[in-house]
């Protein structure tokens, strides 16, 4: 049984094929102009439309496809939507129609969770309740998650950012320092050259929710007074890490026995992962390659759903 998955996010055009033996994927990061912190939805939609034929062609030969799955919305809540998913929808629905196979719709967030569940190294995660932290360019959420036969996972927010996301903090500071968006990888390299021990500002956590925009302002002040850019980079990453840790600790107070799995592009960062792994027990991370936007999780969601449908 083989499923084609498609995900068209704010940052990446992705397609993948998953079956019981593993997966193949191809993806392309959307081009962003120098000094810019992301794309307009209309521009992202255009780039997905340009990228998808190339992305799909690179997966050939696909052999027999039994079902198609795609990211149809951001989160599993009413009104959750972003225009750039239209490109993925068009290709997925058309492909399924031509092949005469079922098409399954999931949330972009569920795809992230499934990619993490499949690659974190703990086969028990995803079989019952667990905590999941989704940290990306558009999301900073601590979730109480559980498997669901139809939508992949239920995910209730138990902590979130009240302003910008950790990914936005990282990218805005990176662009401030002259890096090209998305900035996570290059900012991490700069931070590795710094000896800064802790972020020079206090966290602002309330009922498990965080505020991050103050760190962007602090980084601007550090730059204005001539601080080492590497120290500014490390400050931003440490501040993000400390907030993720504090939100994780708050969730653990309510759910002390549940594992935490971390997903999303920000979780590619080795500094952040090291802090979390050394500070908390029973924490798990998506494979580095599948932390950022991908269609692998979406393909696996479709595979699991299709197996259940066939068995009915």
Tell what function each PLM region has.
Residues 1, 101-131, 301-304:
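Conserved phosphate-binding catalytic cores of ATP/NTP-utilizing and phosphoryl-transfer enzymes
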Residues 8-9, 24-26, 124-128, 133-136, ...:
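A short helix-loop
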Residues 70-73, 136, 261-269:
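Glycine-rich beta-strand-to-loop/alpha-helix junction loops that act as flexible
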Residues 112-116, 286-312:
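Glycine-rich phosphate-binding/hydrolytic loop that grips phosphoryl groups
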Residues 189-260, 266-285, 303-312:
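A contiguous, well-structured pocket-lining segment that forms one wall/lid of small-molecule binding clefts
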């Amino acid at each position: 049984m083989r499923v084609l998955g498609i995900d068209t996010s704010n940052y990446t055009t992705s397609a993948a094929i998953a079956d019981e033996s593993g997966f193949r994927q191809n993806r392309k990061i959307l081009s962003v102009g120098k000094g810019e912190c992301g794309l307009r939805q209309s521009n992202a939609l255009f780039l997905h439309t340009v990228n998808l034929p190339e992305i799909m062609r690179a997966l050939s030969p696909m052999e027999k496809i039994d079902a198609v799955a795609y990211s149809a919305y951001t989160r599993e809540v009413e009104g959750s939507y972003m225009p750039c998913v239209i490109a993925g929808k068009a290709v997925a629905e058309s492909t399924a129609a031509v092949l005469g196979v079922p098409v399954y719709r999931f949330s972009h967030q569920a795809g992230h969770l499934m990619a993490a569940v499949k690659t974190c190294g703990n086969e028990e995660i995803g079989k019952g309740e667990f905590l999941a932290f989704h940290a990306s360019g558009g999301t900073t959420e601590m979730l109480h998650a559980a498997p669901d036969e139809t939508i992949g996972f239920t995910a209730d927010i138990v902590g979130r950012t009240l302003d910008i996301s950790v990914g936005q903090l990282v990218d805005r500071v990176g662009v401030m320092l002259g890096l090209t968006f998305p900035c996570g990888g290059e900012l991490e390299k700069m931070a590795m050259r710094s000896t800064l021990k802790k972020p020079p500002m206090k966290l602002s956590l309330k009922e498990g929710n965080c505020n991050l925009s103050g760190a962007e302002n602090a980084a601007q002040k550090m730059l204005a007074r001539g601080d080492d850019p590497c120290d500014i980079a490390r400050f931003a990453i440490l501040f993000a890490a400390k907030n993720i840790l504090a939100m994780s600790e708050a969730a653990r107070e309510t759910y002390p026995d549940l594992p935490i799995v971390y997903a999303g592009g920000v979780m590619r960062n080795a500094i952040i992962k090291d802090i979390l792994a050394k500070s908390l027990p029973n924490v798990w991370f998506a494979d580095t390659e599948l932390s950022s936007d991908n269609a692998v999780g979406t393909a696996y969601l479709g595979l699991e759903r299709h197996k259940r449908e066939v068995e009915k």
